Curated annotation (Swiss-Prot):
<comment type="similarity">
    <text>Belongs to the globin family.</text>
</comment>
<dbReference type="GO" id="GO:0042744">
    <property type="term" value="P:hydrogen peroxide catabolic process"/>
</dbReference>
<keyword id="KW-0561">Oxygen transport</keyword>
<comment type="subunit">
    <text>Heterotetramer of two epsilon chains and two alpha chains. Hemoglobin E (Hbe) contains a alpha-A chains while hemoglobin M (Hbm) contains alpha-D chains.</text>
</comment>
<dbReference type="Pfam" id="PF00042">
    <property type="entry name" value="Globin"/>
</dbReference>
<feature type="domain" description="Globin">
    <location>
        <begin position="3"/>
        <end position="147"/>
    </location>
</feature>
<dbReference type="GO" id="GO:0020037">
    <property type="term" value="F:heme binding"/>
</dbReference>
<dbReference type="GO" id="GO:0005833">
    <property type="term" value="C:hemoglobin complex"/>
</dbReference>
<protein>
    <recommendedName>
        <fullName>Hemoglobin subunit epsilon</fullName>
    </recommendedName>
</protein>
<dbReference type="InterPro" id="IPR002337">
    <property type="entry name" value="Hemoglobin_b"/>
</dbReference>
<keyword id="KW-0479">Metal-binding</keyword>
<keyword id="KW-0408">Iron</keyword>
<dbReference type="GO" id="GO:0019825">
    <property type="term" value="F:oxygen binding"/>
</dbReference>
<dbReference type="GO" id="GO:0046872">
    <property type="term" value="F:metal ion binding"/>
</dbReference>
<dbReference type="GO" id="GO:0098869">
    <property type="term" value="P:cellular oxidant detoxification"/>
</dbReference>
<dbReference type="InterPro" id="IPR009050">
    <property type="entry name" value="Globin-like_sf"/>
</dbReference>
<dbReference type="GO" id="GO:0005344">
    <property type="term" value="F:oxygen carrier activity"/>
</dbReference>
Length: 147
């Protein structure tokens, strides 16, 4: 089990309370698809992903980005039980979708960039440390079924 200090919990929840899930989720998923284009193969049904402009404007990317970040909110609410929080999603991504678990880490790193750009003043090095710890724990929980 991961230990969270009171300061880490406060830094995570403070930033999370300001997050526009729809906007930041769409941006995070779009950035993932643009920066790491091989991840697009998991989203072939999303239609036009031919350019950064097409990806940023794609309504299915926006909708799924919101869904992904909403799910991430469950980690924020359940910091002491992230492994169980993501058990079913881990199974889905492993057994049915066959997503390379490295992509979870990549998305986590992208999320850090999105949060830092949106909340620069709040995103201190201590805050970044807490969020990096969180995205690593989430990525590990999502990859759990693969082990």
């Amino acid at each position: 089990m991961v230990h969270w200090s009171a300061e880490e919990k406060q830094l995570i929840t403070s930033v999370w309370s300001k997050v526009n899930v729809e906007e930041c989720g769409a941006e995070a998923l779009a950035r993932l698809l643009i920066v790491y284009p091989w991840t697009q193969r998991f989203f072939a049904s999303f239609g036009n992903l031919s350019s950064p402009t097409a990806i940023m404007g794609n309504p299915r990317v926006r909708a799924h980005g919101k869904k992904v970040l909403s799910s991430f909110g469950e980690a924020v609410k359940n910091l002491d039980n992230i492994k169980n929080t993501y058990a079913k999603l881990s199974e889905l991504h492993c057994d049915k979708l066959h997503v390379d678990p490295e992509n979870f880490r990549l998305l986590g790193d992208i999320l850090i960039i999105v949060l830092a750009s949106h909340f620069a003043r709040d995103f201190t090095p201590a805050c970044q440390f807490a969020w990096q710890k969180l995205v690593n724990v989430v990525a590990h929980a999502l990859a759990r079924k693969y082990h």
